[in-house]
């Protein structure tokens, strides 16, 4: 006997109704209004006190609703103070919003009900990257791993001779390859005394020809020079969720700062023309008015206010297996509305470095 049909459900972390706040009923709003009127003399209402008398609502929900009320009061006051709205005389000289502000507003509309899922997924990507073998190889000191990388070519010393550590045969694990390493000149005597530590001595010696070369000693100094990329990834993962990550050393903080400072330079290496065409096309599609398909019984959420058509999942009857259209891979995300980590559906080839003409 054929079993009954089982309707597939979207995970709760991707459903807008599950992650978003529930709507306030008129009874709850009237009750909250009476509570606020009774506390009219207070400068700021206490959310914890209101939550005790308003059953079924948490402190965060009450604070969020009060902020919405404040925003509505501000908008009404602005409309009274500035007659004519945006067409009035005071708005004629108002500058247009910057492009980044337009994209940020559109991204908030797309990922509003899924912000928690997006943040968790982005944090998981950084957590997985912390366990990559290359992260362990590039750390200083290196961590034990079965992966092997290419041998690093160290800088030559004053005599023009290569470092003995780079002349070894066979692949060796990379010890340190981070942006914080600076070129420093080592003493020939110190570099020839111990071939195994000459590569490290060339990095930590003082570039003063008059003073004798000495290796940095002390646990505090070694801790400042240590670079653990696993800790850096964990720090970025905690920061993306608004938490407090592990404390970074001086060298690790320099790596994070160098990554942030290198972002403007990396933008010039992207295929800007193709990326511009894709973003322009995507913006036009998202802002275009959505028309209901013949098989749909009701429009998708979000088509009334912003025209994005991607602010929430579809109704369950639209995702039923009785649909006549052929099942395509992209329909898996259609039930969700958007891809959490890629709301603008940018191809991965457009976020990699474009080949230069010299290559």
UniProtKB/Swiss-Prot annotation:
GO terms under cellular component: cytosol; nuclear body
Q: Mainly localized where? A: nucleus
Superkingdom per UniProt: Eukaryota
Q: Would I find Secreted among this entry's keywords?
A: no
Entry's InterPro entries?
A: SNAPC2
Compositional bias, Basic residues, is annotated for: 1-11
Q: What keywords were assigned to this record? A: Nucleus, Transcription, Transcription regulation
Assembly with partners or alone: Part of the SNAPc complex composed of 5 subunits: SNAPC1, SNAPC2, SNAPC3, SNAPC4 and SNAPC5. SNAPC2 interacts with TBP and SNAPC4.
Described function: Part of the SNAPc complex required for the transcription of both RNA polymerase II and III small-nuclear RNA genes. Binds to the proximal sequence element (PSE), a non-TATA-box basal promoter element common to these 2 types of genes. Recruits TBP and BRF2 to the U6 snRNA TATA box.
State the protein's name.
snRNA-activating protein complex subunit 2
Question: What organism does the UniProt record list as the source?
Answer: Mus musculus (Mouse)
State the gene name recorded for this protein.
Answer: Snapc2
């Amino acid at each position: 006997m054929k079993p009954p049909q089982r309707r597939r459900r979207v995970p709760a972390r991707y459903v807008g109704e599950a992650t978003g706040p529930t709507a306030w009923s008129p009874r709850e709003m009237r009750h909250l209004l009476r509570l606020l009127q009774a506390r009219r003399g207070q400068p700021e209402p206490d959310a914890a006190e209101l939550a005790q008398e308003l059953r079924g609502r948490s402190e965060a929900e009450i604070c969020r609703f009060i902020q919405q009320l404040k925003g509505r009061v501000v908008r009404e006051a602005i409309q009274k103070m500035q007659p004519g709205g945006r067409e009035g005389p005071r708005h004629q000289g108002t500058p247009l919003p910057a492009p980044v502000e337009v994209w940020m507003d559109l991204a908030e509309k797309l990922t509003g009900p899924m912000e928690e899922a997006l943040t968790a997924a982005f944090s998981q990507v950084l957590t997985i990257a912390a366990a990559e073998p290359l992260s362990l190889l590039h750390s200083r000191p290196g961590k034990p791993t079965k992966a092997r990388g290419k041998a690093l070519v160290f800088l030559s010393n004053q005599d023009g001779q290569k470092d003995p550590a780079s002349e070894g045969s066979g692949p060796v694990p990379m010890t340190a390859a981070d942006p914080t390493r600076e070129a420093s000149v080592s003493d020939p005597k110190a570099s020839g005394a111990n071939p195994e530590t000459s590569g490290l001595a060339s990095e930590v010696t003082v570039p003063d020809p008059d003073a004798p070369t000495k290796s940095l000693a002390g646990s505090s100094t070694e801790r400042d020079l240590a670079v653990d990329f696993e800790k850096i990834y964990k720090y970025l993962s905690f920061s993306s969720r608004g938490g407090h990550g592990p404390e970074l050393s001086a060298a690790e903080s320099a790596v994070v700062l160098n990554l942030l400072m290198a972002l403007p330079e990396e933008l010039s290496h992207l295929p800007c023309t193709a990326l511009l065409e894709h973003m322009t096309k995507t913006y036009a599609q998202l802002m275009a008015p959505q028309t209901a398909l013949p098989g749909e019984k009701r429009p998708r959420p979000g088509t009334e206010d912003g025209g994005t058509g991607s602010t929430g999942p579809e109704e369950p009857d639209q995702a039923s297996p009785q649909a006549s259209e052929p099942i395509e891979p992209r329909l898996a995300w259609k039930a969700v509305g958007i891809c959490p980590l890629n709301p603008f559906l940018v191809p991965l080839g457009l976020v990699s470095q474009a080949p230069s003409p010299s290559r």
